[in-house]
Amino acid sequence: QLVDAFRMKDGTAITPDKESGYSTTNYADTKSGWVFAPAGTRNMFVNREPRFYVNICFNGAYWIGDQKTRIQLYYTGGSGKKGTWDFPRSGYIAIKNVSPSSNPKNSNYIKRPFVIMRYAEMLLNYVEALNEYDPGNPDIETYLNLIRERGGLGPVQSDLNQNQMREQIRLERRIELCFEQLRYFDTRRWLIADQTDGGPFYGMNVDAGNSFTDEAFYEKTVFETRVFRPEFYLFPIPQSEINRDPQIVQNPGW
């Protein structure tokens, strides 16, 4: 879901047609404009928006700050299922906030402060609330576009209604704040977790592949099936608390 949420470099959503420029087949003949996508990169990873390349490491990408080492996520690769015990089950590696000086192979990790809140989250909180309270307010586009511009995209479409703008804000929030421990809470307060947090989750086929161009690795494959039930929107009240006050009513489903 997350990998597919990142758009193309012109801001269009990825769709399997010529208009979007997205393709799930074949490989780039030349190096793209992004340093992480060398010649030979699968086309599905080429010409995506800049934030894709600083958040997601895909099969064949250069490692952070290294223009020589291409990450091998296919089955027999160095970072694949056969090559290491801690391979990524989805076929992707999260690299947000990873320092170029880090070297996991040598257990050399660069410490960074934990970010509690940053400016982009404040802006996204503001435009989300404003869109619910006063749809059409010009501040919505102004501050949403600040985030998009910093992320390398053009301005949001200007004639969106409230529902359409809500979807754009939520998408922007998902991309900009990914891997920042917020998505879990967002899907629950929006009451969409029953649609997004359960069912099959897809990735690359980590049980196949002997090279960067092995077609079998790129087959969309279920790597995990999750369960989300309506009662999961709320945590159960501890029985010890209910015992202390019999008037407390347990949350639904628990």
Question: What are the roles of these predicted feature ranges?
Answer:
Residues 1-254:
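Acidic/polar-rich alpha-helix caps and helix-coil junctions
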